[in-house]
C-alpha cells in the first residue's frame, strides 16, 4: 500500500488534470511521481519469490481517461520497471485497447466470465466493481464471450474519498462510519440529483473521476457531507444499474460486488434501496474470492 504522501500526491495530481492540455502543463510533476510509483512497485516485486520467466502485468494509476480523445494516461513506467526488476512487463493496457478501437475501460469482463465459470455461479449474473468509478459486467452465457456486456456506470468511491481527504487526515470513509454518523442534506441531495439527471453533457460522460466534483456539499460537516455524497453515489449507481438490467426486471438476479466500495456498509445499504427487490446484492467474498484483488488478478490474467 502506498504511504500517505504518495497517496495524496496521486489524488492531488488527479484533481489538477481535467483536460488533455493539463498532461503537458504538469508533465514534470507527472514524470517525477510516475518514477516514484514505478520504483515503489519494483521494490514490492523484488520481495516476491518469482522466477525469471514470470510476466508482470503493470496497470498503474489512471490520471486521465477520455476514449473520445483516444487517450488514457496511467502513472507507471513499464520500461523503467523492466530495467529495475529484469522481468517481462505488460503495460499500457487501456491505451492499447483505445488504439484498437476499444473504450479502454472496463477491461475485466473476460476475467469476470472466467470467475463465473470456475466458481459455477448461476447465470445470468452481474458483477459490480466499486472502485473510484463503478463498472459492471453482465455474464449471460458460459460459452459465448460475445454475449458479455461491460461498461462504466457512475462514480464509486471517488466523491466520498475526495471529500474525506479534503476535510480530514483520513484516506477514505472506513466501513462507511462517517456516513452512518451524519445526516443527509435533502435539499442539496435533490439539487445534485436534478443537475445530474438534466446535465446537457450526460451522454458525453467518460466516467473519469473528473466528470464529477464535490463542490455541491461545500459547507456541510464532515459526516453530513459523507452521508449526502454516499446517498448521491448510491442513487446514480442504482439508476444506471437498473437501466442496464431492465430486461431482468421481475426476475431474480444476483449482483456480485467487488472492489473497495463493497466495504462501505452505508453505500451498499443505500444502493439496495435504489434497486428493484428482485436484484440481490452479494459480496463476491461469499464465493471465497477476495474482493480487494479482483482488478489486480484480472490484469495478471490479461498479461
Where are these regions (language model features)?
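Glycine-rich nucleotide/cofactor/substrate-binding loop typically near the N-terminus or early
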Residues: 1-40
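Glycine-rich phosphate-binding loop and adjoining helix at the ATP-binding site
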Residues: 54-110
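Glycine-rich phosphate-binding loop plus the immediately following alpha-helix
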Residues: 1-15, 84, 90-118, 126-197
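A glycine- and small-aliphatic-rich helix-loop capping segment at beta-alpha/alpha-beta transitions
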Residues: 69-80, 113, 117-119, 140-147, ...
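Short beta-strand-loop/turn "lid" adjacent to the catalytic site in phosphate-handling enzymes
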Residues: 24-78
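Short glycine-rich phosphate-binding loop at a beta-alpha junction
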Residues: 52-60, 248-261
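Glycine-rich phosphate-binding/hydrolytic loop that grips phosphoryl groups
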Residues: 231, 282-303
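A contiguous, well-structured pocket-lining segment that forms one wall/lid of small-molecule binding clefts
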Residues: 169-254, 264-279
Amino acid at each position: 500500500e502506498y504511504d500517505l504522501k504518495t497517496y495524496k500526491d496521486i489524488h492531488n495530481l488527479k484533481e489538477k488534470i481535467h483536460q488533455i492540455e493539463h498532461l503537458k502543463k504538469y508533465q514534470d510533476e507527472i514524470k517525477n511521481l510516475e518514477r516514484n510509483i514505478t520504483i515503489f512497485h519494483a521494490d514490492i516485486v523484488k520481495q516476491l519469490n518469482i522466477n525469471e520467466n514470470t510476466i508482470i502485468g503493470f496497470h498503474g494509476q489512471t490520471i486521465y481517461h477520455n476514449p473520445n480523445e483516444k487517450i488514457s494516461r496511467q502513472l507507471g513506467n513499464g520500461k523503467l520497471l523492466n530495467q529495475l526488476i529484469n522481468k517481462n512487463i505488460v503495460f499500457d493496457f487501456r491505451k492499447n485497447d483505445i488504439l484498437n478501437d476499444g473504450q479502454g475501460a472496463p477491461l475485466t469482463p473476460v476475467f469476470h466470465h472466467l470467475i463465473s465459470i470456475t466458481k459455477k455461479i448461476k447465470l445470468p449474473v452481474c458483477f459490480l466493481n466499486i472502485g473510484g468509478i463503478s463498472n459492471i459486467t453482465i455474464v449471460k452465457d458460459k460459452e459465448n464471450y460475445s454475449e458479455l456486456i461491460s461498461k462504466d456506470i457512475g462514480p464509486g468511491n471517488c466523491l466520498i474519498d475526495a471529500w474525506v481527504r479534503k476535510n480530514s487526515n483520513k484516506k477514505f470513509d472506513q466501513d462507511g462510519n462517517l456516513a452512518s454518523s451524519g445526516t443527509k442534506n435533502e435539499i442539496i441531495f435533490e439539487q445534485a440529483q436534478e443537475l445530474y439527471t438534466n446535465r446537457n453533457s450526460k451522454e458525453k460522460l467518460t466516467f473519469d473521476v473528473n466528470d464529477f466534483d464535490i463542490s455541491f456539499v461545500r459547507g456541510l460537516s464532515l459526516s453530513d457531507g459523507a452521508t449526502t455524497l454516499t446517498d448521491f453515489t448510491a442513487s446514480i449507481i442504482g439508476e444506471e444499474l437498473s437501466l442496464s438490467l431492465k430486461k431482468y426486471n421481475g426476475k431474480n438476479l444476483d449482483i456480485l460486488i467487488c472492489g473497495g466500495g463493497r466495504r462501505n456498509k452505508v453505500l451498499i445499504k443505500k444502493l439496495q434501496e435504489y434497486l428493484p427487490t428482485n436484484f440481490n446484492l452479494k459480496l463476491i467474498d461469499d464465493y471465497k474470492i477476495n474482493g480487494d484483488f479482483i482488478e489486480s488478478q484480472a490484469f495478471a490474467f490479461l498479461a
